[in-house]
Amino acid sequence: MIDIPVLDNEEMWASKAVDDHHKMTQLNVPQLMWIDVITAVLSQPTFDEKIGNMGYVFKNMIAKYVSSAEYYLVSYGAFNELIKPNPVLLRLIEADEPLDMKKYFYGKDKPSLLEHMVRTSVTAKALLSLGKSPSKEDVSYILRNSGNVAIVLREEDKLLSKSKMPKNWAFSDSYHARYIEAGVKIVENIRVRRNGTIYR
């Protein structure tokens, strides 16, 4: 059975930031592709996020990058309500089996949803601030530090939807900072492996 350490104070989150950065550097093939695509888009002389739906399209690219991660994090609430009471699901997670997020966590009929720990609008603003023809290294740095997807309860999401990244937050800081302010706790040692399907 999984022991459930929970990160719920600033000292633990600060030390966790180092581990976060290490894990974030381990990108998969889809994420590497999205770095190339987003760099190419930003380098186009005619690119303008204000034209048509391009702002939405651009933020969707960022969301696809983040959602392409192999593992998603889990909130304390989601673990206690959805995973812990379901021995079959718990065994699948313990066995590191790839899961269909829609089957267990995503959809209008589910009490949980998939939440981006750093809002795509924050990441988009940072990327756009790089100007025309940004370096791939600068784009990669922002994307690598743009957080992860967390499985959270809808009740927890109501707290998060009212929150922004903390004042003076930077991409060099832990992407858990918004969760600290909202009081939403993440289970430290649980990672849910995603199958090939991305839900947005």
Question: Whereabouts are the PLM-identified features?
Answer:
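Nuclease and nuclease-like effector domains acting on nucleic acids or nucleotide cofactors
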Residues: 1-109, 162-169, 173-199
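Amphipathic alpha-helical interaction surfaces
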Residues: 95, 120-124, 155-159
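Histidine-centered nuclease catalytic patch
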Residues: 104-142
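Extracellular structured ligand-interaction cores
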Residues: 109-114, 146-150, 176
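Short linker/helix segments within small regulatory modules
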Residues: 131-147, 168-170, 179
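Alpha-helix boundary/interfacial micro-motifs
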Residues: 133, 199-200
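Short Cys/His-centered divalent metal-binding micro-motifs
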Residues: 143-169
